[in-house]
Regions:
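Basic/aromatic-rich interaction segments and small domains that mediate binding to polyanionic partners
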Residues: 3-65
């Protein structure tokens, strides 16, 4: 379980064949939702702002040590 303001790695396609699709992006937890889902903000200046905020499943997140 992740906490609000915790930094994580977000991987949209963790089981993809391509390394580029499996590569994670740094994100911060904004909110904890029901059904093991989280609202995150992706720290990627190359992404348009409208795509940086997402609701994702916990299995797409990994903690940053």
């Amino acid at each position: 379980m992740y906490r609000i303001d915790q930094w994580v790695t977000y991987c949209q396609f963790p089981d993809a064949q391509s390394e580029n699709l499996r590569k994670g992006k740094r994100a911060v937890i904004l909110d904890r939702l029901s059904n093991n889902r989280y609202e995150i903000y992706i720290d990627d200046p190359e992404m348009d702002d409208k795509w940086r905020r997402k609701i994702v499943n916990a299995e797409n997140l990994k903690p940053i040590d």
